[in-house]
């Protein structure tokens, strides 16, 4: 077998980078695999903060597994092929570590697959370290903690599993940081949107979902001031229309999430706005609506859209 590439999803967030970085280390130590961690995009500002804080180099970015001479890959923090590497259907998926729904995915051969309904893929990777009795180095503990903090908004998201609180406490101790202090600093580092173009803003954390034959793009940005983001609404909508036309998305849903007050504004465009409105029981006005208490794409947006589009 050629070298195994380990990577998270496209437009990688902190959990995608952290879980793949840590699993690459574990694969070598516990399973004697010849792996290399790579990424399907550059780290965002939140992830860059974590990488810099713990002295970790960002994984190199690749666009094709076969171009790297790899015939087998390991996926972390995703399993759906539309969210993965461009030639995912041309290589063999050796393993998966994920905490999302399983969909748009199939393999010709059996594989190692660890999927749990917890707050982050990083939580699962940490558990794998413990199960295989592999010590967690400080930098890896820090990155795994960062992935968990990011995906659960410092354990405030409804996706947070009861076990995640213990995991976060243990990782914070191993990483030598104060959980709340480090967590808020990292999350705030990811809310600097002023320097982003509208095209960059809608692509910071975006995933494509195949919903009943529709390619639906669901993006999320975190902020401490929703009104400031909505001041750019017209330009954001223009960027959304442009990417919908170029990429063939039927619909685009942008979550603008207030990480302080735990609410989101939904900005949506596309061919199926009736289904979007039905999903959340709201009425879009000028393409947007307020969604109280919504902070999680995985639990509070995608399942609702999936049900509505499937109806």
Swiss-Prot record:
Enzyme's top EC category: hydrolase
EC number: 3.6.1.1
Gene3D superfamilies: DHHA2 domain (3.10.310.20), inorganic pyrophosphatase (n-terminal core) (3.90.1640.10)
Catalytically driven reaction(s): diphosphate + H2O = 2 phosphate + H(+)
Subcellular location: Cytoplasm
Binding site residues for Mn(2+) 2: 15, 77, 99, 151
Domain of life: Bacteria
A cellular component annotation (GO) from this entry: cytoplasm
Keywords, comma-separated and alphabetical: Cytoplasm, Hydrolase, Manganese, Metal-binding
Primary site of residence: cytoplasm
InterPro entries, sorted: DDH_dom, DHH_sf, DHHA2, DHHA2_dom_sf, Mn-dep_inorganic_PyrPase, Oligoribo/pAp-PDE_c-di-AMP_PDE
Cofactor: Mn(2+)
Residues that hold Mn(2+) 1 according to the record: 9, 13, 77
UniProt-listed PANTHER family: BIFUNCTIONAL OLIGORIBONUCLEASE AND PAP PHOSPHATASE NRNA
Similarity field: Belongs to the PPase class C family.
HAMAP family per record: PPase_C (MF_00207)
Protein name: Probable manganese-dependent inorganic pyrophosphatase
Protein species of origin: Streptococcus equi subsp. equi (strain 4047)
Classification lineage: Bacteria, Bacillati, Bacillota, Bacilli, Lactobacillales
